[in-house]
Amino acid sequence: MALLQISEPGLSAAPHQRRLAAGIDLGTTNSLVATVRSGQAETLADHEGRHLLPSVVHYQQQGHSVGYDARTNAALDTANTISSVKRLMGRSLADIQQRYPHLPYQFQASENGLPMIETAAGLLNPVRVSADILKALAARATEALAGELDGVVITVPAYFDDAQRQGTKDAARLAGLHVLRLLNEPTAAAIAYGLDSGQEGVIAVYDLGGGTFDISILRLSRGVFEVLATGGDSALGGDDFDHLLADYIREQAGIPDRSDNRVQRELLDAAIAAKIALSDADSVTVNVAGWQGEISREQFNELIAPLVKRTLLACRRALKDAGVEADEVLEVVMVGGSTRVPLVRERVGEFFGRPPLTSIDPDKVVAIGAAIQADILVGNKPDSEMLLLDVIPLSLGLETMGGLVEKVIPRNTTIPVARAQDFTTFKDGQTAMSIHVMQGERELVQDCRSLARFALRGIPALPAGGAHIRVTFQVDADGLLSVTAMEKSTGVEASIQVKPSYGLTDSEIASMIKDSMSYAEQDVKARMLAEQKVEAARVLESLHGALAADAALLSAAERQAIDDAAAHLSEVAQGDDVDAIEQAIKNVDKQTQDFAARRMDQSVRRALKGHSVDEV
C-alpha cells in the first residue's frame, strides 16, 4: 500500500491525452534535459547530437549565448562568460569571495548583500544566469517534442539549503517553466536505477559532479525509494580536480600565479583535457603557454587523493546515520561525470567492498530519473505507485524559556512532513510570543543555528499557562520550511517561510552532528539545569503575584516562612546545583500549600456571592 502517492490534483490527463513533461539536470558544469517517449526515458540532444549542454553563458550588449558557443568565448572574454553559476546560488557576496577568491568576474553587492555579476549586458544575479540555461534546455525540449512543456522536474544537490532551492525555483519561473517539483539528484538517480534493474535492498548513490558531491543511502523495496540518510559537500566536485591539476601544470610550466585571465583559462582547459585523457591513458602530453610536458595518471591521482578521501569520509558518516554497514550495501550507483576518473571508481569499490555500477551513463542518469518523475507528476501515470521519501539533514525546532531548544522535526525525518506542538504563555497577561526557529542537534540555543524569528501577537490576556499556541512546522517536497503559530481560542496566527540568504556546508553539518554526540552527556545536564531554573522563575513569578493579591490571608509567621523559602529558591536558582533547585522548589510548594487552598476557597466564595443554592 502506498505510503505517499506522488500526484497532484488536477494534473491527471484523460486516457487519450498525454501531457508534455521534462526532467532537467541543472548541473554545475553541464546540464541535460530528458523526457519519456514511448515508455522510455531518454535525454534530448541538440542539432549536432550532443546531449550535454555546458552550463556556461556568454553575455554581450546585444544578447547572450548558452552552452558550447558560450564556452568558446571563455578564454577570449572571461569577465563576460559565466560558468559554474550553480556554486553561486543562494550565497552572499562575502561567502563567494571567501570560498572562490579566484573567480574572474567582477562583483557588486545588492542591498541585501547578495552577488551581482558585472557583464556587458548589465548587472546580473546568479538566478538570472541559471534562468538563461534553463531557457536553452526548455527550447531544446519544446523543439524535440513539438509542443510547449506542461511541467518540469528540476534536480538539485541533496545539500542545497532553502535559499538555494528557492533560487532554483525562481530561475525556472523566470525561464517561463512550471516546476512540478525539485528533486534531489541522488534520488533521481535512484529512480532511474530502480526502474531499470528492479533490485531491492540497500543501495548507495555516489554522486560526484562538476561542483557538488552527494552520497545517499537508500532502501529500495517493491517500488518504494526511501532515503535512509544523506551527506556530501556542496562545494566539492570535478571542478576542484581541474583546478588542482591546473595549479600543478602552472607550477611545472613556471607560469606566474597572477597571470592574466586568458592564460588562466588556457591552463584550466588544458587541465580538463588532461583529466579526461587520463581516464583512459597512463600519461598525457600537455601544451600550454609555450610549455610542453608529460602528466601521468599517478601524478594526477596524488593530487586528487585527498579530495577523494573527503568523499569517502562523507560516505562513512552517511552509513552511520542510516544505521547500516558498508557490507550491507547491495549496489553502489555512480552518478556524475567525475565518477569516470579511475581513482574514484577504485577507491569507492574498495570502500564498499564491491565494484560500483556504471552501466547507466553517469552523466545522464539524473536527468533520466527526473524525466520519469516528471512524467508521473504531470499526470501521465496516475496509477503509479512509485514512492519517494527524502529526508532533512538537521533537526528543526524552537527556542523555549531558558535558552533551550525543543526539537519539532528530528533530522533524517522523511519529507514532505508536517509536525505540530502546543506551547503556552509564561507570564500572566502575556499577549505576544516570540517564535525563534532553530536548526541543529544540541540542547541549547547557543549551540544551534538560528533560522528565523517572528512574533505572534493578539494572544488573549490570561493567567500564565492559560493560552494555548500550536506551532506547526511544515517541510514541503522541495525541502522548504514553513512555520505557523496559532492561538487556539481566537484563531489568531502568524507564519513565516524560511529562506536564509545562504546555508551550511556539509562540513558544518557534520560538525554539528559530531558535536551533538561528543557533548551529549554535558548537554543533557545543561538542559536539566536550565529546565529547573525556568521552573524556579515560574514558581517565583506566580508566588509574587499571589502575595501581591492575597497576602492578607497569611499570618505573620506563615508569610515569613514563605518569604524565607522564596529567598532560598531565588538564591540557589543562581547556581548550578540541579538537585538543590529542585528541593527548593518543593519547599516553596510545601510552604504555600495552605495559602493556595485559602486562595481557592476565597475565589469560590467570591464566585458564589449573590447566588442562591438553587442557582448553583
Curated annotation (Swiss-Prot):
The record's family statement is: Belongs to the heat shock protein 70 family.
Gene3D superfamilies per UniProt = 1.20.1270.10, 3.30.420.40, Actin, Chain A, domain 4, Substrate Binding Domain Of DNAk, Chain A, domain 1
Q: Which Pfam families match?
A: HSP70
**A Gene Ontology molecular function term of the record:** ATP hydrolysis activity
Which gene name belongs to this protein?
A: hscA
| Main function | Chaperone involved in the maturation of iron-sulfur cluster-containing proteins. Has a low intrinsic ATPase activity which is markedly stimulated by HscB. Involved in the maturation of IscU.
Which InterPro entries does the record match to this protein? ATPase_NBD (IPR043129), Heat_shock_70_CS (IPR018181), HscA_NBD (IPR042039), HSP70_C_sf (IPR029048), HSP70_peptide-bd_sf (IPR029047), Hsp_70_fam (IPR013126), ISC_FeS_clus_asmbl_HscA (IPR010236)
Return the protein name.
Chaperone protein HscA
Q: Which UniProt keywords apply?
A: ATP-binding, Chaperone, Nucleotide-binding
Q: Which organism is it from?
A: Escherichia coli O127:H6 (strain E2348/69 / EPEC)
List the GO biological process terms: iron-sulfur cluster assembly
Q: Which PANTHER family match?
A: HEAT SHOCK PROTEIN 70KDA
Q: Which domain of life is it from?
A: Bacteria
